[in-house]
């Protein structure tokens, strides 16, 4: 009987990571043991430690989901000319990227979401690093678009800084995602998921201070949906 096919060190390392991701995503950092990962990867504990010195090191490696996604979005964001319309588009993109499947992400996106939520409950490192990458990716074009909206009179002055408004919108999108992360949503909004997202975006951009006139002029969901091709 032929033996198992030999694989090189990089392939073995990737196999371990692929085995670890769904375990961390489904059971959290604390609920997953090195033995669980070794068993799922079909390797011994000793061989696993040859590639990773600790469970924490494997957890850190899994952050590569955002390493794949964010640089691509950043390159395309930097091509956008800051304006009120782009400010609305960026926040629309937040909701669409968080609530709907990112093309080409496959299972990685769902695992990333579960890892993020588990991280908020226990080992905060994954969430902190992931959210920091998001902020670094979007901060410059968001800041310039806020300034453009203020200069155009499209946004009212609020006693809330831009960074907080940025995060408030993101947290609303994350909260909606959390309520729908299982196959059965936690709430029945009595509308389609697409309409729910569009209503949430409207609620969010109104909340950050955009005027009715600016929203009426620039908040065109069908156009914004088409503009998503600019990012992906």
Model-derived segments and spans:
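Amphipathic alpha-helical segments used for helix-helix packing
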Residues: 102-132, 178-181
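C-terminal peripheral helix-coil segments that are non-catalytic and often amphipathic
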Residues: 93-100, 136-152, 156, 167-232
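Hydrophobic alpha-helical connector segments
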Residues: 61, 74-111, 159-162, 166, ...
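Short Lys/Arg-rich basic patches
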Residues: 5-6
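Helix-turn-helix
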Residues: 15, 23-65
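Conserved hydrophobic residue
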Residues: 30, 43, 125, 155-156
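Amphipathic, non-transmembrane alpha-helical scaffold segments
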Residues: 17, 63, 128-139, 194-197
